[in-house]
Structures are given as structure tokens and as C-alpha cells.
């Protein structure tokens, strides 16, 4: 395995320690790696004039983008979850990792941030359970094969690619329809654009969650302790578990409701899912509290939006 990146990081150093040959710098070319490669996988951020892509084409080496590669892997799993949405993908994927690992399902996980539980952003399991973030940028998630498509919210983003919100909604609708006849869509019912995504989608199996009782999954008896919520999870009017979160904010109530809903569809009961969710204390660079400076709280949060 070989590759290149702009900068050295903990992830690339980990790969190097495992034997990967990596070169660094803008426009870096791992010529030796390309010469030996039978397949070149590139990120959506790498354009056609990237020197390694140009070299691979010249040598007739097969090229596929990361989404297509991940989709090809995903296709082999009986239970495959694609976690999509403008916000909340990494956090919800991480919550699912905690819940499914806690349920001893030995899942394969691909997450967009570093999660301490799995020692990075990838976990290779030996079961039929696969969970990955599903990003809409360049319509990447349309190359996936989800049996469960989770949509946390839909807003204007990646406007260097999409023309506007209507095109984004259309893309998410195509993603939802990847589950037609084979699985489920789990959707945040209170989001107006998610509602547009699923408008008249009567031929899909849709499970909703939100803050109101009109949705399939919703919270009751919410209490905050220093910003950290605890609440009862209700499913179609019945309490199925209680969750005491170790991450702050109402948005994480929604993320945990989505996690319980997906877990239920994968055969994990709500109580077991709740125990796993409660062990989740956040991922790196997702509203990560780093400490204090001159009396101010320092938060590290990675975001384009």
C-alpha cells in the first residue's frame, strides 16, 4: 500500500508504521507506488490534473474514486448503514459505533473523524454489519449500497459543486431511493428540507425521529445537567429506554434518537443501544473541549459550513 498526502498526520504516521509508503507535499508524486500499483484510489478533492492521477492514466492503471471504492466494499455487507446529512454525520456514525460494538456485533466502521474507541477512523470487523459516513459532495454517496439510509438534516452546503438547495434535495432523494425494496430510510422528520427529500416517497420504508411526538422516535422528560441531556426515548408512544448523554446539546438528543432507530432495525434492542450511546464522549475536532485560556473555554471544531 502506498499513497500521498499534503501533510504528515497521526493517521499517515500510523499507516507508515503499518508498512505503507507515503510521500508528502502539495503536488507530491509517489512514482514508485504508482509504478507498482494495480489500482489507484483518489479522493473527491483530487482533480483530473493531479500529477498522480495523470501518471496513473498514462500507465493504464485502473483509477476509481474513494466513494466508488467504499461502495464496492459496502456491497458485500448484509446490513449496511450510510449516515448522511449536512451536520451530524461523524457524531452519529460514532454513536452507532459505540452502540454496535457495545452490542458485540463486531461492525466494520468508517468514520470521518478520529474516534478513540476504534483508535482512529477505520475499524475492520468480521460480521455482516457495516457503518459509514455518506457525504453528498460530488454526489459521492450515490455510489454506496446502503440497506439503511440515515438522513440527519439537509441544508445548503458544498455550493462549489451544487447549484443550490433544490439540487441538494434532489441528490439526497436519490440517496434515499437506494434503499427501495431492500431496506429503510431513517430521517429527521422535523427538518423542512428532509421533508422535501421524502415528499410523496410512499414506496420507501421510512422511519422518522424528532423532538415531537408525531414522529416514530422522540424524547420525553428531558433534563439537562451542565448542558448534558438525559431523557426517555419514546417509540410510537411507548418508552423503550432512558439515555444519559455524555455529549452536550439538543442536537445530540436527535443524533442518539437516530442511533436507537438504526440499532432497532439492525436487531439491537433500545436498552442495549442506550448503554453503548452513554459510553460516547465525543470525537476529536467535533465540538471538542480542549481546555481553558485566560478564563475562556477553548473548543476545537472542524467545519466547512
PLM features: residue spans?
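Active-site flanking residues adjacent to catalytic metal/cofactor-binding acidic residues
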Residues: 4-6, 132, 187, 299-300
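Active-site-proximal loop->helix
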Residues: 11-20, 77-78, 118-124, 288-290
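Adenine nucleotide phosphate-binding catalytic loops in nucleotide-utilizing enzymes
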Residues: 43, 162-169, 183-187, 199-305
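Residues in the short beta-alpha loop(s) of Rossmann-like NAD(P)-binding domains
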Residues: 5-7, 113, 190-191, 212, ...
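Structural/interface elements that position substrates and couple domains in central-metabolism enzymes
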Residues: 8, 22, 74-78, 299, ...
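Phosphate-binding loop of NTP-binding sites
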Residues: 24, 30-37, 44-189, 193-204, ...
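NAD(P)-binding Rossmann-fold cofactor-contacting core
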Residues: 2-14
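Conserved beta-strand positions in the Rossmann-like core of class I SAM-dependent methyltransferases
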Residues: 2, 108, 207
Amino acid at each position: 500500500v502506498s499513497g500521498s498526502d499534503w501533510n504528515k498526520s497521526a493517521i499517515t504516521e500510523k499507516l507508515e508504521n503499518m508498512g505503507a509508503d507515503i510521500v508528502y507535499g502539495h503536488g507530491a508524486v509517489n512514482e514508485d507506488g504508482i509504478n507498482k500499483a494495480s489500482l489507484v484510489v483518489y479522493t473527491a478533492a483530487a482533480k483530473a490534473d493531479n500529477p498522480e492521477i495523470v501518471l496513473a492514466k498514462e500507465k493504464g492503471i485502473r483509477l476509481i474514486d474513494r466513494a466508488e471504492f467504499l461502495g464496492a466494499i459496502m456491497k458485500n455487507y448484509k446490513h449496511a448503514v450510510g449516515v448522511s446529512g449536512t451536520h451530524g454525520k461523524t457524531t452519529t456514525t460514532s454513536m452507532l459505533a459505540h452502540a454496535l460494538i457495545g452490542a458485540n456485533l463486531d461492525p466494520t466502521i468508517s468514520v470521518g473523524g478520529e474516534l478513540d474507541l476504534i483508535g482512529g477512523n477505520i475499524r475492520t470487523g468480521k460480521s455482516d454489519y457495516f457503518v459509514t459516513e455518506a457525504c453528498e459532495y460530488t454526489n459521492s454517496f450515490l455510489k454506496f449500497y446502503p440497506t439503511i439510509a440515515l438522513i440527519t438534516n439537509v441544508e445548503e452546503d458544498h455550493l462549489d459543486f451544487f447549484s443550490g438547495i433544490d439540487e441538494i434535495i434532489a441528490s439526497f432523494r436519490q440517496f434515499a431511493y437506494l434503499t427501495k425494496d431492500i431496506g429503510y430510510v431513517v430521517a429527521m422528520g422535523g427538518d423542512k428540507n428532509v421533508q422535501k427529500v421524502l415528499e410523496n416517497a410512499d414506496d420507501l420504508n421510512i422511519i422518522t425521529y424528532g423532538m415531537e411526538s408525531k414522529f416514530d422516535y422522540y424524547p420525553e422528560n428531558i433534563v439537562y445537567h451542565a448542558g448534558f441531556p438525559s431523557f426517555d426515548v419514546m417509540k410510537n408512544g411507548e418508552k423503550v429506554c432512558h439515555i444519559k448523554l455524555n455529549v452536550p446539546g439538543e442536537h445530540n438528543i436527535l443524533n442518539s434518537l437516530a442511533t436507537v432507530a438504526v440499532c432497532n432495525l439492525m436487531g439491537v434492542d433500545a436498552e442495549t443501544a442506550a448503554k453503548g450511546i452513554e459510553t460516547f464522549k465525543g470525537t476529536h475536532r467535533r465540538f471538542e473541549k480542549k481546555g481553558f485560556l485566560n478564563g475562556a473555554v477553548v473548543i476545537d471544531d472542524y467545519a466547512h459550513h
